[in-house]
Amino acid sequence: MWNNDVSISKQMRIGVVSYLNSKPLVEGLQSLLPKAILEFDTPSRLSTRMKSGEFDIGLIPSVEFLAWENSTFIGGIAVACYGQVQSVCIHSKKPLNQIRSMALDEGSKTSIALMRVIFEENNWKLDETKSFPMDGNPHDIHSDAVLLIGDRAMADYLPGFPFKMDLGEEWKRLTGLPFVFALWAVRPGLKLSAMEIKAFHEALNLGK
């Protein structure tokens, strides 16, 4: 259930993902919406905080958004890829088809869901998963592989993990389609003006 106690006001609260891949979407947004309050967090925490009523607008994981009722989004803007995404990758000690255990970055449920679809489509078996904290060190992992998102996923290769798969690239290989990781969700009951919507599109243009 949504918490709709937050009233609509000119000082809207905007939840933003604290990764480099979202920077093009927020470049200049504060100057375009000077009364807005921008707060940065991980995708999964933003989703929880927005649903509890902390944000009017949030850059929310697509899997989370699809499960929400009565919510809308700002069209034409997303964290998306058509092929390599670079910031959502599996780093593995073994060839991908030999992985049996994986540590999963706690920062994004969308990336975990995408990983599971990719494994199913490839008929790869995964017996064990565990959560990998945002401040965790990959070198402490005893699993066969680790799914990383955000800035720390962007290393070419991690020492001790000679195999790597970019999930955006693998999704395109399997389906030929782009993939949307996150979008600007708007809480139920909030009606954005044309100028406010335009500000988000202008921010994207500034970030390109």
Q: Positions of the model-derived regions?
A:
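Pocket-lining segment of extracytoplasmic ligand-binding domains
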Residues: 131-208
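A bilobed periplasmic-binding-protein/Venus flytrap-type ligand-binding module shared by bacterial periplasmic
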Residues: 28, 88-96, 101, 179-195
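Short, polar/charged alpha-helical segment
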Residues: 18-41
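Short helix-initiation/N-cap motifs at beta->coil->alpha
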Residues: 37-48, 124-144
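Beta->alpha turn/N-cap motifs
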Residues: 19-21, 42-43, 54-66, 77, ...
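A conserved helix-loop-strand patch within extracytoplasmic ligand-binding domains
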Residues: 77-135, 165-166, 170-172
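Short, well-ordered beta-strand elements
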Residues: 8-18, 36-39, 100-105
